[in-house]
Amino acid sequence: MKIALIAHDRQKPLIVKLATAYQPILAQHELFATGTTGQKIIDATGLSVKRFKSGPLGGDQQIGALISENKMDLVIFLRDPLTAQPHEPDVNALIRLSDVYEVPLATNIGTAEVLLRGLDQGLMAFREVVHDQDSNPINL
């Protein structure tokens, strides 16, 4: 699966801890991240992460573009709900796209853990089933 990892500045230490704790699970998947978040995860874990621009410089939009092309399967976006963000419209657009394209999205550590544990247990096959049905329609 293709997984995006994003975190606001005050949440970056937390997403690094998450990536460290779930490194064996994350290592089995293709990882993407905004610039600084991705570098911090790489430095802490050695995981392979495709990095985009920093969120305020368009990284959120780059990940949103992948979502809109059905090229992203899961998004972990640890937001800082107590600090105003200069790129808040980009953040809202990314969340909206996740809803439109039915991409599982975690915006806090509790939900992120549930998604990663579910992924590890094979409980997140919905998108794969939908993609298989879309590419192999059954004619009745």
Curated annotation (Swiss-Prot):
NCBIfam families listed in its UniProt record: MGSA (TIGR00160), PRK05234.1 (NF003559)
Purpose of the protein: Catalyzes the formation of methylglyoxal from dihydroxyacetone phosphate.
Alphabetical list of InterPro entries matching this protein: Methylgl_synth, Methylglyoxal_synth_AS, MGS-like_dom, MGS-like_dom_sf
Regions that span the bilayer: none
Record protein name field: Methylglyoxal synthase
GO CC, any one term: cytosol
Keywords of this entry: Lyase
A GO BP annotation: methylglyoxal biosynthetic process
Residue span, MGS-like domain: 1-140
UniProt xrefs under HAMAP family: Methylglyoxal_synth
Binding site for substrate: H8, K12, T34, G35, T36, T37, S54, G55, H87
Keyword Lyase part of the UniProt annotation: yes
Molecular functions per Gene Ontology: methylglyoxal synthase activity
Catalysed reaction, written as an equation: dihydroxyacetone phosphate = methylglyoxal + phosphate
Keyword Lyase belongs to the record: yes
